[in-house]
Structure formats: structure tokens, C-alpha cells
């Protein structure tokens, strides 16, 4: 199934919204901090690349990968 650009962007926006909520609720981040984390992550780059198919996964799955990236960045 081929999505229109509008449909694809809607899915991305919904996923980002969920990740922002998770960061705020689970990690106590402010909204600005949460947006900064998401939009500056490699996960966001992959999410917005239709070829990766990451946008087809659940927000929870995507958030788990974001958490792994955040942990990896802390350890460096």
C-alpha cells in the first residue's frame, strides 16, 4: 500500500506526539526538552525515511529504540 505524503506525515506526527508524551511522563522531561530529544535523534531521521519502514511500527516500539539511543549517547 502506497501512502500519500499527507498520510505519511500524519503517521509521523502521531508517533512523535506519543514519544513526546512518553518522555514527559516517564522521564519528567519538559515539552521543549522532549521535542529537542526527538527531533535531534537518529531515530527521528529513520522514522521520517519512508524506506526504513520504521513508521509502520508502534509508538512504543519506536520509543524503546529512542531510549536505547539516549542511553548509548549518555555512555559515550
Which ranges hold each PLM region?
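C-terminal alpha-helical interaction appendages
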Residues: 1-76
Amino acid at each position: 500500500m502506497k501512502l500519500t505524503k499527507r498520510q505519511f506525515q500524519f503517521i509521523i506526527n502521531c508517533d512523535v506526539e506519543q514519544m513526546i508524551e512518553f518522555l514527559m511522563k516517564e522521564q519528567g522531561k519538559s515539552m521543549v526538552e522532549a521535542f529537542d530529544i526527538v527531533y535531534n535523534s537518529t531515530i527521528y531521521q529513520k522514522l521520517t525515511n519512508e524506506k526504513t519502514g520504521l513508521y509502520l511500527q508502534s509508538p512504543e516500539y519506536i520509543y524503546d529504540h529512542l531510549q536505547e539511543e539516549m542511553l548509548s549517547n549518555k555512555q559515550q
